[in-house]
Amino acid sequence: MLCFSLSQPRGKHKLNYTQFHPISKFVPSPHPRGLHISPNERFDPHHRWSHILCLVLCSSPCYFVSLLLYPSVQAPHLTGCKSREQETFRCWWSPGSFQNLTEPGALQIQYWKKNDLTKEWKECPDYSSSVKNECFFNKNNTVIWIKYCVRLHSESQNKTYDTLCFELQDIVHPDPPVALNWTLLNISRSGLNYDIMASWEPPPSADVSVGWLTLVYEVQYRRRNSSHWKVLEHEFGTQQSIYGLQTGEAYEVRVHCAMRAFNHFGEFSDVIFVHVPEIPNKESTFPVTLVLIFGAVGVAILLMLIIFSQQQRLMVILLPPVPAPKIKGIDPALLKNGKLDELNFILSGAGMGALHSYPPDLYQDVPWVEFIELDADEPEPGEKDNQSSDSQRLLGHNNHHTNHGCFHGLSIPDDDSGRASSYDPELPDQETLMLMAALLSCQPNKVEPCLGNCSHSSTPSLDVLEVPCPGLQAPDLPPEGGERHLVQTQLGGPQSWVNMDFYAQVSDVTPTGGVVLSPGQQVGAPENTPTTKKDKKGKMEGGEEESEEEEERRTNKLKFQLLVVAPEAGGYTTESSGRQMSTPDPSSPGEVYHTFPPPSAESKPHQEAYLPATTLLGDYQSPYILPDSPPAQFLPPVSDYTVVQDVDFQHSLLLNPPSPQRSPTCSPQPPSKPLPVMPIGYLTPDLLGNLSP
Amino acid sequence: MNMMQVMQSVVWAVLLWPCLVSLGVPLECKDEQGSIILCASISKEKLLDRVIQHAELIYRVSEESCTLFEEMFVPFPMRSQRNQAGYTCATKAFPIPGSKSEIQQISDKWLLHSVLILVQSWIEPLVYLQTTLDRYDDAPDTLLKKTKWVSEKLLSLEQGVVVLIRKMLDDDMLTTSYYEQGVAPYALQPEVLESVLRDYTLLSCFKKDAHKMETFLKLLKCRQTDKYSCFLH
């Protein structure tokens, strides 16, 4: 009996379920009516497991015994109620093994609804004829959201064997979807895998369009011979993609649906078969890699061959040789060995036209009357940056020059007798130094104007200067346009000074500060005035300076002075000192040679006048060199400029070669240079080497 | 609670700005109280879609909560209540027809009003349910979160339905309900079977009513799109 009771727990419960009254409400109580729960089962959620355990333990002996003693007795019970579309539902029962209840009509299905007015059990409206033991509730008898209770009742015995309560929406098991089909999405590149898209349609009985039913679908697939279905995630739409199927394998796919959130899945649809045959590999990767390897090797071999065969050329292309210094159009051999005459000739433009194409003579007979406009142009930055030493610059233009005319007082603010036209007194000293160097060489090249700090914005650029070197521009060149062609690099080779007049005398100064120039000397005696550092202050003193300068210019035609500007010293030689120094007598070169700080006594008054101007510029130490003209050789008349002949041991420049009796006190002269001949002004490297620093 | 709601809606509005621009304005559109006005104009169809989304989500979450609660607290024999006469959910003030045909004949106005009544009737019980669940010792976090989420979404659903009614029926008489923290009517100890069953009943009834709301709204939508076929069955 124990086994019997244990083996049929459900029936036992149902047998005791007789006290249920359909009308009574369900009142929560420890022992709900109609449901017999043993005390120890009430609070034990796992009592089912104990049931099963006992079953297992007892099943074998008890079962067989019970079978022997009692053939399987099963009470009539309701097997279930289901709705397909939430509009109708059916209930099925089983009569069990009770012998006396197997005849039809012995058992009835009775039901009632919560909202019934009569509160009585009603007979099943429709016992279906086709299916045995089925009760069908049609649309008219079906309501939703209202509790139904269905019971299996035997009238004759007045006994209810089973009861089932539910609401319509809880028993919906939708029909299977229809029209399940699949399409191939893609095949992997290796040809081993592919993806498909399975699509279907909702069951026709489900009224999805109206929204009466909202379905969720579940797709399952498996390999043909496997027993385990792979379940995919629930899908709300009517298609699902399946990834990772293997070619050559046969698959089965099926789908079923449930009402959303109720999880009572309906029956499965028909199974469809998916199969994609294997695709033979059109190409295997092995030859491709082989080809690639061979190709790479071949290319490498080719490259090597090219390199080895064209080695020389490649070396030239990759590592171009450093070009030797040369001047365009001039044979480097000329530069080496001191063939200066020829070089000068060439450079003067009379030679090849590749050189600077200035018209060879310009200024010789052109009266120079012009007004200089002093503009505060900034010198070009490129030219400002040149910071090479002044001595080198000047030495580059030194001894071989006759400083005819090429030296304009570039920024020589005062004592500018004989300064060329368009001379700008505002130029900074460095620039003037540069310009002077350039002018010495008298090349129509550019010169880096700044020897030192050239950042005086107030000082006009070199543009204003128009150096009437051969080949220079016309006098009417605007000052700022004059630019750099006036300023010439010291690299510009030596220029023949002979018979060139590069300078013009300032014949007059207008009250407004313009300078009136007159043509310079025929003989290329460069006229120069001792220069000094000049700055704004110098310009401010403008008017009287101008007059002074002009006067000085007029008078001092001879002398070039070498000014070594020391910070403490004014760094300039005045007109008087220049005058003093400018003796045309070459025999007394010593007097010409001045180095600062010791200025001459006569020059002092002038110096003092200019001292404040010059001391302001004391921060740069660039020696301010005025080439001194070797007077006697060239210039019967006054010459204001001197070529720097040499540098003595004190870093002072020798403007005139010392006379033989004075030679011991002077630095050795460059041996290769004949003094009477005005050097062209090009210092060859070997000559320079002879100069002691 | 209102402030939180408003804040949440503002945050969502900011985050979903591009969506909002394309889809319209979120449901939280309280014009009458001078609170945050996020509505500019939204078409009826989009609003209805939004409301249906809400109803569907609420229904799904309520079903999940019911299942969770059942598994955790309800003894096995009482699950699904197959064999019981059933519990009685709180009766509503109006009878709701049961059959599909009857329901399909309900007018738009009636559908919307019944949805609104359903929503409004469940706001307070859900809040009560939250407090009760908090007293359970081992209530899973997900359950608590779900019930909290549902009660919040119910409020926004209510607002949406109010706006929908105003738009579709030109009925301006409705006001949204204001939640007030009420005293819990039952002060029973938690985890006693009675309270467990009561809560279980509550959840099940709410699940049913959520299903009702969803169905009504979907029927309404069907009528908006294709009036003829919706009345056919």
Curated annotation (Swiss-Prot), chain B:
GO terms for molecular function: growth hormone activity; growth hormone receptor binding. Pituitary gland. GO terms for cellular component: extracellular space. Disulfide bonds join C29-C39, C89-C205, C222-C230. The keyword Signal applies. Residues 1-24 form the signal peptide. May be associated with ion regulation and reproduction. It is found in: Secreted. One of its GO terms (biological process) is animal organ development. Keywords: Disulfide bond, Hormone, Secreted, Signal. This is Somatolactin. The keyword Signal applies. It comes from Oncorhynchus keta. Belongs to the somatotropin/prolactin family.
